Design a protein with these regions (language model features):
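Residue-level recognition of single "structural anchor" positions
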Residues: 1-313
Length: 313
């Protein structure tokens, strides 16, 4: 298989040809994991023998046996890599979201297996996005997701999960446009949660625009420039903060449209999926490869917090 040029997925047909066998998938994973050739994690030697066993290499210097999928999202998997690659491809290509029910039908596996595969991929998305921060002029707002109650709407709505959403507001010749996005599910809408969110996701001395809700007052005491706006006298919040409201609206439609039966326990992973894809909307041609790399980088321990049974995949 040729690796001199980055693969750009154009069609399902092309994908099926390039990754039609386990061997093709293993070769591609090895190229991504060791772009300059095999490196033994034990002695740093670069010479190895390819083993007949699935994805294993043996170091010529110290005889260390290394698996290309060890320590990744594919660690100890019993599922074919061709099916894993297909799931990652579908997650990368489908802007509206991809459900476990769809994957179950497409690769002919049990629903729990399809569900686990997609959630492990979402864990990789979540871990990857934790490394990045947003900066510049930021719109910051809160919202509520989910809930079956038809009672109170808006802030404090019953049975709903609070979130904080921050969106870069980039200047253009004709006005502004949204940049990168950060979203977090919080236990409650409080000053403590606001502080923790902005400290971990926004570069210091960025300009943060909010409404006049009291919990945002904490920003005045932090290393940011805080601009607070009172949304009254006919001025609507959507007019003052158009981009963050657009992101919130699209997030709600994403969850209701594809994951409307989502367990609140895993809601953060659906939010992570939405945020990951949104932040890479300008690099859609490369999204499959980026997501595959994210799956190689995540530790197996990270996705075990979801309660997956060992060797269930």
């Amino acid at each position: 298989m040729e690796f001199k040029k980055r693969i750009r997925i154009i069609s399902v047909k092309e994908f099926r040809i390039k990754f039609s066998t386990e061997e093709n998938c293993l070769d591609y994973l090895a190229k991504l994991r060791w772009p300059n050739g095999f490196v033994c994690p034990k002695c740093q030697n670069q010479e190895s023998y390819r083993q007949a066993e699935r994805g294993f290499y043996r170091c010529k210097a110290c005889d260390n046996k290394v698996s290309v999928i060890a320590g990744t999202v594919f660690h100890s998997t019993n599922l074919r890599l061709t099916d894993w690659f297909w799931a990652i491809y579908r997650m990368a290509q489908d802007k509206k979201g991809f459900s476990a029910m769809q994957l179950m039908k497409e690769i002919d596996v049990a629903y729990p297996t399809a569900w686990s595969v997609l959630h492990k991929i979402r864990c990789a998305m979540e871990e990857r996005d934790k490394q990045y921060h947003i900066k510049g002029r930021i719109e910051l707002d809160d919202a509520y997701l989910g809930g079956k109650s038809k009672g109170k709407r808006g802030r404090g709505a019953e049975g709903k999960v609070p979130i904080l959403v921050a969106v870069e507001k980039r200047q253009t010749r004709n006005g502004t446009k949204p940049g990168y996005v950060a979203i977090r599910i919080v236990k409650s809408l409080s000053s403590v949660e606001v502080k923790d969110f902005v400290d971990s996701k926004i570069v210091p001395w960025s300009i943060i625009e909010t409404d006049a809700l009291s919990v945002y007052g904490i920003l005045d005491d932090l290393d940011f420039v805080h601009e607070s706006f009172v949304t009254e006298n006919g001025i609507k919040a959507k007019e003052l903060f158009p981009w963050v409201h657009l992101v919130i609206g699209n997030l709600k439609r994403f969850i209701l449209g594809t994951h409307h039966h989502a367990d609140p326990k895993y809601l953060r992973l659906y939010v992570s999926e939405y945020c990951y894809r949104l932040n890479r909307r300008f690099h859609e041609d490369d999204l499959f490869e980026h997501l595959l790399k994210a799956c190689l980088l995540i530790s197996p321990r990270k996705h075990n917090i979801l309660g997956f049974r060992k060797n269930s995949l």
